[in-house]
């Protein structure tokens, strides 16, 4: 467990960890290429290593012993039939992307599963989409969750329709699978898209590895994606940028506390949706300094509550919830039904756990209404095996009066293995027992 005492001041320079989203996509694209790629500055986390393991099961050769550079020999656009069940641990991204890719094995079946949390995550929308393409993919339990069984087979149809307001990972999986088709093909969105920046990341990484995706808009709304057939993944030397989601906890701590911190490896031109945290804290009243590749914060700042649409930034919800507790007035988080489909129901978890600390939060179907109380009290916090809750609640504990105990700190291995060391390095009053 993590034990946190109120922290009076934070000071220093930290480097944002490499992006989890970019690392996943880059290593899987490299694993399909017709040559040798390098992934430079990858995120060496449990989730991303699940993608390494899964890609190797499908025929890639990957040397991940150097934590600063992974060397990937691709399977030459020909995934191999795995010789065992593909266990992807706790990585939903890996499960969803490789479910599509696994359909391109030459014979037999691929079975994909994971830990006790992963086998509860919804998969049916992706399975239905793959079935539309003529691919046989189904839940072994017939309930739309892993274990997932995928049969080898060519893509027979060239149009797939899928909701845009569920998980963008389903669409990412289709984008990375459909270039194997002999035909030009189309992904049509049947509902407005949420988490669009994650698809921009997918398209950006695919482009670097030689695969092109065209976006089509109707009345300024994204409605479909067009994917040319017979495309081939090409090798590439890919450098992973910093993770804005992980940086958000340091940004929150910086604006709330007496601080003088610099966060490196966060780029102004990033396609990551979670870079929106910079705009959010500015709108709330924190004039933080942005440079080309870093953020400088000299807090504390007096924040005011605002309304925040989290359609494209679901991973920021726990961070925003903490900020709202200390802002003057009301902070409303809305358009976040999909936040309930993450590692846990994050809307429920934030409302329930922060209330223990004295927060005034009303849970809504699509978000949270947070009345700024200006003060929290230490409490014992459950984190539901969710890495983002561990990190957000740590910031809450640093601001709270008294002692805060956070359970399940091992979850940070998913996205930010050295989180505790990093936040201690700038002055957080934390011990681990």
UniProtKB/Swiss-Prot annotation:
Q: Subcellular localization, per the record?
A: Cytoplasm
Question: What's the name of the protein?
Answer: 3-phosphoshikimate 1-carboxyvinyltransferase
Query: GO terms for biological process?
Result: amino acid biosynthetic process; aromatic amino acid family biosynthetic process; chorismate biosynthetic process
Its biological purpose is as follows:
Catalyzes the transfer of the enolpyruvyl moiety of phosphoenolpyruvate (PEP) to the 5-hydroxyl of shikimate-3-phosphate (S3P) to produce enolpyruvyl shikimate-3-phosphate and inorganic phosphate.
Query: Cellular component GO terms, alphabetically?
Result: cytoplasm
**Do you know which InterPro entries this protein is assigned to?**
Enolpyruvate_Tfrase_dom, Enolpyruvate_Tfrase_sf, EPSP_synthase, EPSP_synthase_CS, RNA3'P_cycl/enolpyr_Trfase_a/b
Q: Does the keyword Cytoplasm apply?
A: yes
Q: Which PANTHER family match?
A: AROM/DEHYDROQUINATE SYNTHASE (PTHR21090), PENTAFUNCTIONAL AROM POLYPEPTIDE (PTHR21090:SF5)
Question: Catalyses which reaction?
Answer: 3-phosphoshikimate + phosphoenolpyruvate = 5-O-(1-carboxyvinyl)-3-phosphoshikimate + phosphate
Tell me which residues bind 3-phosphoshikimate. Answer: 20-21, 25, 167-169, 195, 315, 342
Q: What organism does the UniProt record list as the source?
A: Methanococcus aeolicus (strain ATCC BAA-1280 / DSM 17508 / OCM 812 / Nankai-3)
Q: Which residues form the signal peptide?
A: none
């Amino acid at each position: 467990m993590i034990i946190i005492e109120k922290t009076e001041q934070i000071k220093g320079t930290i480097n944002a960890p490499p992006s989890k989203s970019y690392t996943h996509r880059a290593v899987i694209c490299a694993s399909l290429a017709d040559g040798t790629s390098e992934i430079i500055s990858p995120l060496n986390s449990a989730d991303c290593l699940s993608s390494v393991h899964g890609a190797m099961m499908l025929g890639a050769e990957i040397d991940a012993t150097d934590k600063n550079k992974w060397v990937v020999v691709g399977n030459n656009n020909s995934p191999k039939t795995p010789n065992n069940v593909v266990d992807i641990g706790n990585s939903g991204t890996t499960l969803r992307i490789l479910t599509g890719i696994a359909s391109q094995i030459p014979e037999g079946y691929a079975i994909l599963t994971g830990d006790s949390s992963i086998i509860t995550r919804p998969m049916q929308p992706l399975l239905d989409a793959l079935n539309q393409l003529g691919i046989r993919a189904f839940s072994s339990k017939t309930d739309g969750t892993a274990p997932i069984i995928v049969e080898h087979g060519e893509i027979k149809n060239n149009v797939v329709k899928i909701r845009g307001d569920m998980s963008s990972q389903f669409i990412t999986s289709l984008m990375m699978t459909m270039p194997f088709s002999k035909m030009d093909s189309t992904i049509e969105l049947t509902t407005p898209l949420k988490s669009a920046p994650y698809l921009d990341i997918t398209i950006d990484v695919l482009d670097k590895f030689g695969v092109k995706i065209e976006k089509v808009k109707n009345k300024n709304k994204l409605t479909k994606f067009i994917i040319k057939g017979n495309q081939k993944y090409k090798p590439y030397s890919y450098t992973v940028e910093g993770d804005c989601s992980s940086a958000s906890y340091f940004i929150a701590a910086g604006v709330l506390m007496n601080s003088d911190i610099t966060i490196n490896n966060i780029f102004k031109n990033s396609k990551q949706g979670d870079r929106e945290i910079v705009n959010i804290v500015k709108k709330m009243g924190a004039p933080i300094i942005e440079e080309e590749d870093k953020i400088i914060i000299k807090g504390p700042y007096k924040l005011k509550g605002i309304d925040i649409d989290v359609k494209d930034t679901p991973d920021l919800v726990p961070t925003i919830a903490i900020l709202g507790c200390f802002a003057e007035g009301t902070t409303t988080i809305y358009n976040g039904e999909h936040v309930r489909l993450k590692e846990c129901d994050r809307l429920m978890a934030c409302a329930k756990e922060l209330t223990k600390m004295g927060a005034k939060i009303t849970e809504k179907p699509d978000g949270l209404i947070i009345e700024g109380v200006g003060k929290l009290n230490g409490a014992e916090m459950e984190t539901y095996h969710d890495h983002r809750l561990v990190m957000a609640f740590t910031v809450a504990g640093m601001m709270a009066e008294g002692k805060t105990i956070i359970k399940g700190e091992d979850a940070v291995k998913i996205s930010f293995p050295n989180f505790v060391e990093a936040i201690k390095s700038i002055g957080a009053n934390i011990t681990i027992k």
